[in-house]
Amino acid sequence: MTDVALALVALVVMEPVTAVLHRAIFHGFGMGWHRSHHEPPRHALEANDLFPVVFALGTILVLSIGVWIGGDAVLIPVGIGVTAYGASYLVVHDVVIHRRLPWPRIHNRVGHRLRAAHNVHHLFGRAPYGFLAPVVPRDLAARADARGIDRTRRTIGTATDSVSA
């Protein structure tokens, strides 16, 4: 497998890995940090911002080992794929969805779908845990619809029941 293909595979595999990590860590023992993301923002930075720092350090370690091993080490393209996923997540999640930096709203089907899925996650503190290809469980979509909530326009991070449901 070429390095480019390996990097692309790593990028794609990161979506289910991220979903599992989000469910197990962010909404598990890491909820102390992650809770700040489900509450109204009080500062430019939130405790939840420590997660990408920790994950970036892990990726830097993988890339460093790949460079140290040299030769045909698969760690470098894997590290590049993981880094590409992390950069995509940062731009889509923090910039486009949460608008933590000035950025125009994205008005297309993909942006609409990503915002709607992420809003459901913030509303109920449950799935979808993935991000670039989220699947909203039917029961949660129906629950939001039954409450008359426009899942695409909800202000993210202000739901009163965001982590209690």
Model-identified regions with their sequence ranges:
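Hydrophobic transmembrane helical bundles of multi-pass organellar membrane proteins
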Residues: 1-165
